[in-house]
Amino acid sequence: MSSRGGGGGGRRGGRGGGGGREGGGGGGGGGGRGGQGRGDLGVVGERQGGGRGAGERGGRHDAPRGRGGVAVGAGAGRQQQQPFHAPAPPSGGGGRGGVQVQPNAAARRPVGGGRGGVGVPAPAPAVAVGALCGEMKGKMVVSGGAPPAGQGSSLAAAQGTDNVKREPSQVAAPAPAPPPATLPPSSSKAVTFPARPDVGTIGRRCRVRANHFLVQVADKDIYHYDVVITPESTYRERNRSIINKLVALHKQFLDGRLPVYDGRKSIYTAGPLPFKTKDFVVKHINPLRGNQREEEYKVTIKQASKTDLYSLKQFLVGRQRELPQDTIQALDIALRECPTSVNFTCDRYVSISRSFFSQSFGHGGEIGSGTECWRGYYQSLRPTQMGLSLNIDISATAFYKAQPVMDFAVQYLNIRDVSRRLSDQDRIKLKKALKGVQIVATHWKEKSIRYKITGIPSAPMNELMFDLDGNRISVVQYFKKQYNYSLKHVNWPCLQAGSDSRPKYLPMEVCSILEGQRYSKKLNEHQVTNILRMTCERPAQRESSIIEIVNTNSYGNDDCAKEFGIKVANQLAVVDARVLPTPRLKYHDSGREKVCNPSVGQWNMINKRMVNGGCINHWTCLSFASRMHVNDIRMFCEDLVGMCNNIGMQMNTRPCVDIIQGQQRNIEGAIRNIHRQSSEKLDQQDLTGQQLQLLIVILTEISGSYGRIKRICETEVGVITQCCAPKSLQKGGKQYLENLALKMNVKVGGRNTVLEDALHKKIPILTDRPTIVFGADVTHPSPGEDASPSIAAVVASMDWPEVTKYKCLVSTQSHREEIISNLYTEVKDPLKGIIRGGMIRELLRSFYQETGQKPSRIIFYRDGISEGQFSQVLLYEMDAIRKACASLQEGYLPPVTFVVVQKRHHTRLFPENRRDMMDRSGNILPGTVVDTMICHPSEFDFYLCSHSGIKGTSRPTHYHVLLDENGFKADTLQTLTYNLSYTYARCTRAVSIVPPAYYAHLGAFRARYYMEDEHSDQGSSSSVTTRTDRSTKPLPEIKENVKRFMFYC
C-alpha cells in the first residue's frame, strides 16, 4: 500500500453528475515515500500519508458529462483524520515528485529533504500535542528524532498537500513569501490602519459625479464648552428649547457669539466666551406636564477645550494620521444647527441621527399598519482627499401616523370587530409595536398631557383593579366617577405609562399618537414594498433632488455657517473613476458554452451547464398551500426536476415518497411524518444509511411559516429544504425554475460556476497559496426587542483555488453587541483541562479537512460595523483570529487582510451623460471603482459598484482595509473583490457586496428564525436580568448533514 508522490485520480468517479464528490479524474495522492496509505482516496482508517485525488474538484478537463468537473484535478489530496499538527515535526524527506514547501508566516529553516522532496523545519524537543481533528482522540508525542518505522514523514502528514504537485498547466510561478503576521496592539488607542499603498490603474477611465460638496473653512479658533442642565433632561428637543431660550435671553453674557449645541452636553463657539464658567437660570414649560406652570432649569456652561484648524488641515493632506474629531464634530454641528433649531423658519424638521425629515418634502403617504412614509435628507461632514466634503443624500423612513391609538390598533392588528376581547397574542403584538411611543391624553379639555407607553396589561379595563382611597376600583369605574366619562371598549386592555411599581393606566380610546415619531420596528413585507415604491428614484431624479436640498438649505446665508466661516459648494464633486474588466466564468465542458463573458454584470444559463452539478437521489415535496391542487404541484416538481437535469445536476425524476398535502396548523407533524415515511421507504429499498437529501416545501398562502419550517428542518429533523412561495410557483416560468435549480445545487454540495482565472491560478494573492476567505456579520434585534440576543454569523470558503463553497457557523451573543464574541473560546474543564473552540478554529479545521491544506493566507471581509467601532472590533477580533490559529499549531500565524464592508452609507455616484458610461437603468456601470478624492485622505479604502442597477439609484459598497499583512496593492484587492461578486450562487448576476459578506448576512438572518417567538411577552420587559438571560441562550444546534452544505442559500 506504499504511495508515491503523483498517484492516479479518485476511483469513485462515475457517470453520475460531474464534479463534486463523485467526480473522478487525474489527481495525485500525497503520501511520502515509504509512507503507508492509499494515494487515491485516503479512506478513513488508513494510515497517514494518503490524500484524496481529484474528487472534490472534478476530473479530466476533456471528460464528457458525468465523468468529472472542470480542469482542476491535479492532486489536492485530502488526508483524512489529519488535523493541523503541532510544533516542528521531525526532519525527513517528502514524497517523490513533490515541490518545495512555501514557508508560512513563521520563518522555518530547511534542514533536509527526501528525493525530489521538501525542506523541513529544524527538529524541536519532544512535545505533547492535543489531537485537533474530531475523529482523533487522546494525545500523541512528536519527537525531534527520526520518524518511527512505517510511518513516513510527519511533515507530509502535517503539511501533505503543501508539497503535492499539480498539473503543469495550472501551477503558477512560485510567489514570494507573504509578509510575517503581526500581533495587534494591546489598546484600541494604539491601533493605526494601513496607509493607502497606491492608487488603482486597472480598468477603463471615466468620470462620475458624487453627492459630496466641497467645504471651505476660515481659520478660526473653535472653543468647546461642557453644558449641564439641572434637573437633567434626556429629551433633546426640550434641551434645545432651553438652550435656545438661554441664547435669546442672555446675549449680553455671550459676547455676541452664536453658539451651536449638540442637544446633549456640548456647546461650540467660534471664538471664546467672556467667562470660563457661568451659571444661568432658564424658565421653560414642560409639554409632558401639560399647560401648567413654568419649570426652572439651571444651566452651567464650562470651558472644556480649544481646538484650531491646523491639525485638521494636516490630517487632510496626510501629514497626520489621527483625525481631530472635536474639530470635525464642531463644524458638523454648526452645519446642522439651522434645520434642528426649533426656530427654523421652514416647516419643522424631525432630526433622527444625521437625517432630517419633514412631510413638506412630499412623495410620502401611508404604507400600511398605521404607519406612513416621511421623506428627508441625510447630511454629514467628512474628511476626504479633496478636503472637507458635505455628504448629502435623499433619505426616507417610516413614522407612526398621528391618529387615535384605537385606530392604530385596528389597522395594525387588522381587526374588524372591536367589541371582541383582544386576544393575548394580539395584545403582545400591539405591546411591542407601541412600546416607547409618545401619546397625548384627550379626556381633559383644559389641558393636554403627554405620556410614554411602557406596556399593555393583560387584564381588560373592566377587570383591571387598583386602590383608590382604600377601596378597589376598576379603570372603567374610575373614569366614570372622576371624569364622568363612559368608556366604550371595556373589553380591551389599557395602555400603561410609568413604571411597573407606579403605573398609570390610560384607556386607548382617550389617547392619540403624537406626530413626528419614527416607527423603528421591523417593517412587514407590505410596508417595505410601499416605502420602496414611494422612494424609488432614477439616478438623474435623485441627483436633482439632492441639488434642490442644497439650494433650499442655502448654507451661504445660514447664520451659524457664517459664524464659523463655513462655505459649501453648490455643485456635486466630479470624481475620477475606472470601470474594472469583467471576469470570465467557467462552466462545464459538456455545455455548448464552456466559458461565459458576462455583459453589464449579468448573464444566463442558456447553452451552459453547472460546472459541478450536484446529485439528488432522494427528494420529495410537502405542500401547505391549501388552494393549490396536488396535480399542479406534481407538474411543478416535474418541471423543476427537468430544469435541474438540463443544466447539469443529476436529480432523480421520481420523488422518494409521493407529494403530501400538509396542514398549516400542524407544520411540525407534517414535516416529521414525511421524513419518517422517506426513511422507511429507503430502508425498504435496502438503502439503509441513506437519507432524504432535499425536501421541497410549498409554503402557505399566509406568511409566517417560513422561519418555523427552516428551524424544524435544519435544527431538529436534519434535512435541507427548498421553500417555494405559492404566488411565485403559480407564475412559474423558466427563469424562476432556473433560479431554484441554482440554489438547490449549492445546497447539496455542487458548484454553479467558478472564475476561470481561479482555476488557472492567475488571481494574485488568492491563488498563489492556499487561501481561506472569511465573511462575518452580526444582526441585531429590532429596536424595542430589548430581551433578544444579537446573532453572529461567520462563513469561510471550503475550496481552493475556486473559492465558491462557504461553510456557515452561527452563534448568539449579548444584546446589540457588535464584536463577535465566539470567534475563539477557551473553557476550563476539571477533567479535560482547557477546551479550545470557536468559529474561526472550527472553520480553519474544516478547510484543512476539505482541501488537505492549511491556509497560508486569510482574507477576512467584515460586514456591519461603523467607523466608530473600527479600532475596537479590529483589536478584539484579530486577537481571536490569532489565538484560533495558534491553538491549531504552534507558530501558525498566517498573514491576515481584514477588510470592513460598508453598505449603509450615503455616497452615491452618478454617471456622466454618456450612454456608454451607464447601464439601462441610468446607473454607473458594474465594476466602477473610486479610490480618490471622496475617499479617506490617507487610509486604504475604495468605493466599488459591482452590480447592475435594476430600479432606483445603485449604491456602491465601501471597502475599508483595517489590517493588511498580505501586501495587497489597490488594483489587486479591488479586482479580487469585484471578481468574487460574480460567484454568488443564487443568481446569474454580479451582486452588490462581496459574496462571503453576503452569505454571512444570510446566515445570521437564518439563525434569527431559530429562536424568534413572535408571541413571547419578554420582548417588552425592561428587566436587566431577563435581557441577560435571553442574550446568553445558545442557538439550537444545526444538524451536521445540513451544516456541511450551503443550507442558508
Swiss-Prot record:
GO terms of biological process kind: regulatory ncRNA-mediated gene silencing
Of the GO CC terms on this record, one is: nucleus
Coiled-coil boundaries? none
Listed A to Z, the keywords are: RNA-mediated gene silencing
Pfam families assigned to the protein according to its UniProt record, in alphabetical order = ArgoL1 (PF08699), ArgoL2 (PF16488), ArgoMid (PF16487), ArgoN (PF16486), PAZ (PF02170), Piwi (PF02171)
Q: Which family does it belong to?
A: Belongs to the argonaute family. Ago subfamily.
The UniProt regions of compositional bias labelled Basic and acidic residues, in chain numbering, are 54-65
Q: What is the lineage of its organism?
A: Eukaryota, Viridiplantae, Streptophyta, Embryophyta, Tracheophyta
Entry's InterPro entries? ArgoL1, ArgoL2, Argonaute_Mid_dom, Argonaute_N, PAZ_dom, PAZ_dom_sf, Piwi, Piwi_ago-like
Protein's organism: Oryza sativa subsp. japonica (Rice)
> Low complexity bias: where?
144-160
Is Chloroplast among this UniProt entry's keywords?
A: no
Ranges of biased composition (kind: Gly residues): 1-53, 66-76
Entry function: Probably involved in the RNA silencing pathway. May bind to short RNAs such as microRNAs (miRNAs) or short interfering RNAs (siRNAs), and represses the translation of mRNAs which are complementary to them.
Name of this protein = Protein argonaute 12
| PROSITE patterns named among the record's database cross-references | PAZ (PS50821), PIWI (PS50822)
Report a single Gene Ontology molecular function: RNA endonuclease activity
Domain spans labelled Piwi? 694-1012
Using the UniProt annotation, give all residue ranges assigned to the region (Disordered). 1-101, 144-192
The answer to whether the entry has keyword Repressor is no
* PAZ domain residues: 404-515
Gene name, Swiss-Prot/TrEMBL: AGO12
